Amino acid sequence: FEKVLKTIPEDIPIIADAKRGDIGPSSKKYAYALLEQFGCDAITVSPYMGYDSIEPFLNYKDKGIFVLCLTSNSGANDFQVPNLYLQVAEKVREWNVHSNLGLVVGATHPERVLAIREKSGPMPFLIPGIGAQGGALEKTLEAVQDGTRVPCLINASRSILYPEKSVVFNDFKETQEFSSKDCISSSRHAAHELHQKIRNCLEK
């Protein structure tokens, strides 16, 4: 993790998708490690254990804290729906006294995004699920913005890390020939395509 961080240019914000959330003393150590020791600019946290598990992160007023609200995985329906995600959005709005809180809202639930926005008010959304999970980018952005132009961050992981999933290697030699340079080029192309797709949605 530390080696990866060292390769990131200083002007690029680093969000640790750590999903931390534990009893107060443990959360305090997690917050110190990720936000101070490693110097991440933001972190994702789980609200399931309540305010005292989140408070140590909130004390870092110059850091961004994204709270899991409605996640992009299919298991989100087990507990978060039908009402828990709305309670989270409302509660996080109360906790946002330093204006450094945001919500993690999956793009796989575009029909629920507007309800979250109504509960949360104008706080940033971190939106996963656009790539490999097949989230609805355009519908999600329409609901998130809703005429407010509130900032949101689109997260894509697997679709950029593994853009060549359709490539089938017949033997180890072929795998070697598909060099790291090819991987970087493919990932760069996938990121550019997503960036353009987002721009097109916002310009409509």
Describe the predicted segments one by one:
Residues 2-10, 29, 33, 56, ...:
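Alpha-helical scaffolding segments of alpha/beta enzyme cores, especially the outer helices
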Residues 14, 65, 103, 125, ...:
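Hydrophobic/aromatic residues located in beta-strands of well-ordered beta-sheets
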Residues 1-7, 23-27, 48-62, 108-118, ...:
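Active-site-adjacent beta->alpha loops and helix N-cap segments on the catalytic face
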Residues 107-155, 159-166:
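A C-terminal functional module that forms or caps the active site or interfaces directly
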